[in-house]
Swiss-Prot record:
Membrane-protein topology: Multi-pass membrane protein
GO molecular function annotation: transmembrane transporter activity
Organism: Yersinia pseudotuberculosis serotype IB (strain PB1/+)
Keywords, comma-separated and alphabetical: Cell inner membrane, Cell membrane, Membrane, Transmembrane, Transmembrane helix, Transport
Complexes and interactors: The complex is composed of two ATP-binding proteins (LsrA), two transmembrane proteins (LsrC and LsrD) and a solute-binding protein (LsrB).
Gene that this sequence comes from: lsrD
Family per similarity comment: Belongs to the binding-protein-dependent transport system permease family. AraH/RbsC subfamily.
Signal sequence segment: none
Organism lineage string: Bacteria, Pseudomonadati, Pseudomonadota, Gammaproteobacteria, Enterobacterales
Protein name: Autoinducer 2 import system permease protein LsrD
Location within or outside the cell: Cell inner membrane
Amino acid sequence: MNLYRRYGWELTLAALLVLEILLFGLSNSRMLDINVLLFSTSDFICIGIVALPLTMVIVSGGIDISFGSTIGLCAIFLGIVFQAGVPMSVAIPLTVLVGALCGLINAGLILYTGVNPLVITLGTLYLFGGSALLLSGLSGATGYEGIGGFPAAFTDFANQTLFGLPIPLVIFMLCVLLFWLLMHRTHSGRHVFLIGQSSRVARYSALPIARTLCMLYAMTGVASAIAAILLVSYFGSARSDLGASFLMPAITAVVLGGANIYGGSGSILGTALAVLLVGYLQQGLQMIGTPNQISSALSGALLILVVVGRSISLHRHLIYEWLQRRRSRKASV
């Protein structure tokens, strides 16, 4: 009973995930093939790598919608640096540093201006996206071709397996463990929850708000860079649009995973399960021949339903009191 109280939503998501796979399996038996389930994660698991630190950002009361552009910028930066003759062993760490810098720019602007994080990251979304397009044009990369010619060892990396699991999935699982420990087993993780519950109380309690926010946004930038590196390896080319479609699925996964969009609560394990739920939803719809437009519309509808459901859950005591008052009025009449 205590386990269900503590992990009730996560267990519900796990049950929904199994049910979803079984339902799609009735329409297409390939959905029940363990190899298909494992290797199809490579198409969407990079969304999860970014969604994990994004969960911590949202729990802190902030938000970052610029990560898609950060992925594109890091991808094209990696391609340009490689074109310039820099070895991949140096280009990859430099790309991670660029991602961290993008995150620190977000944090610095939010802390310095005091403007809502949504507005700041909306601005940097266009800033990083425009920079990626500019660099792409300067490098001569056009259309869907991007920058190619990477070493075979690099392009094979994201398509290899470790213990029978795809490398991107293994990296995602390691990230889940890392962020779960950070969020639920460290003082920094407790600070994230406290800042999200009340930034004013956190400030009066002398919590390191600035340092914590810088860490969170920098981690989101680093995760975006890692996702960019994996995507370039997976597709074999660096393009400025690689993260363009990540925004809605990532935020949907975070909110569906149990994070309060207003801050103060959230779950890394819930986000991880929600990533699989949303990812397999899109994969399953494609397998049964559903157009991409309908798949995107369903993802949007799912996000709205989750936000409405979470809002009702958070204010259920107010709704209950309102219903009680209505019954009392009717009884008195």
